[in-house]
């Protein structure tokens, strides 16, 4: 990797990969950079709010299922708008999915991390850079109020539930040989 690509790789590692590895207990809090320790606070808050709202469960047994479910949910999440709050929801969702895979002992957590990394690189990073990059994300994480966190969590949940409901309906139609 060279120049600009290395900078982008480092941004994604700082914001996304470090938190996911911390969340799934691959690294301790002491191994997080000072920057990662700061953003961990807002991401942990998002995760706690999400826990109070709903239990998210997954049915993931293959690389393709991970890619399909992950891409479906996050594409819906960012369909009409990218903002820092939704990016927080994306990171927490990615961490939750990776933890599910690790806890299920199916050794697919690295697929989640790679899929999340690639989605962020290709779909979110240009927006992030044009909106202040790491510094602005840190500012957002330090100054978010409870209302904006709850609003973003509710929006994320509506997108997640819509996607999962749609997938369930499609599966039901397939099972009944209607499509």
From Swiss-Prot:
Stated induction or repression of this protein's expression: Expressed in the early phase of the viral replicative cycle. Expressed in the late phase of the viral replicative cycle.
| Gene Ontology MF terms | BH domain binding
* Motif BH2 mapped to chain: 126-141
Query: Quick one: signal sequence residues?
Result: none
Locate the motif BH1.
76-95
UniProt keywords (A-Z) are:
Apoptosis, Early protein, Host endoplasmic reticulum, Host mitochondrion, Host-virus interaction, Inhibition of host apoptosis by viral BCL2-like protein, Late protein, Modulation of host cell apoptosis by virus
Name the PROSITE patterns on file: BCL2_FAMILY, BH1, BH2
Q: Which domain of life is it from?
A: Viruses
Subcellular location(s) per record = Host mitochondrion; Host endoplasmic reticulum
Q: Which GO terms describe its cellular component?
A: host cell endoplasmic reticulum; host cell mitochondrion
Q: What InterPro entries does this protein map onto?
A: Bcl-2-like_sf (IPR036834), Bcl-2_BH1-3 (IPR046371), Bcl-2_fam (IPR026298), Bcl2-like (IPR002475), Bcl2_BH1_motif_CS (IPR020717), Bcl2_BH2_motif_CS (IPR020726)
Which BP terms in the Gene Ontology apply to this protein? regulation of apoptotic process; symbiont-mediated suppression of host apoptosis
Which protein family is named in the record?
A: Belongs to the Bcl-2 family.
Q: How does it assemble?
A: Interacts with host BECN1 (via BH3 homology domain); this interaction allows the virus to inhibit BECN1, and thus autophagy. Interacts with host BID. Interacts with host BAX.
Q: What does this protein do?
A: Suppresses apoptosis in host cell to promote the viral replication. Has the ability to potentially bind to all the members of the proapoptotic Bcl-2 family. Inhibits autophagy by interacting with host Beclin 1 (BECN1).
Q: Which PANTHER family match?
A: BCL-2 BCL-2 HOMOLOGY REGION 1-3 DOMAIN-CONTAINING PROTEIN, BCL-2 RELATED
Q: What is this protein called?
A: Apoptosis regulator Bcl-2 homolog
State the organism named in the record: African swine fever virus (strain E-70 MS44)
Taxonomic path: Viruses, Varidnaviria, Bamfordvirae, Nucleocytoviricota, Pokkesviricetes
């Amino acid at each position: 990797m060279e120049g600009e690509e290395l900078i982008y790789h480092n941004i994604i590692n700082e914001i996304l990969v470090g938190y996911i590895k911390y969340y799934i207990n691959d690294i301790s809090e002491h191994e997080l950079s000072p920057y990662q320790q700061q953003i961990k606070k807002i991401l942990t808050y998002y995760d706690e709010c999400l826990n109070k709202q709903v239990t998210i469960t997954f049915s993931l047994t293959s690389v393709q299922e991970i890619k399909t479910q992950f891409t479906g949910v996050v594409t819906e999440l960012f369909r009409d708008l990218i903002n820092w709050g939704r990016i927080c929801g994306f990171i927490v969702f990615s961490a939750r999915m990776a933890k599910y895979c690790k806890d299920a002992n199916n050794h697919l957590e690295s697929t989640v991390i790679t899929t999340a990394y690639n989605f962020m690189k290709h779909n979110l990073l240009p927006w992030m850079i044009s909106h202040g990059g790491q510094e602005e994300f840190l500012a957002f994480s330090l100054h978010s109020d409870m209302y904006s966190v709850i609003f973003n969590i509710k929006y994320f949940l509506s997108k997640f539930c819509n996607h999962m409901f749609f997938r369930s309906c499609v599966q039901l139609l397939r099972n009944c040989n209607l499509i």
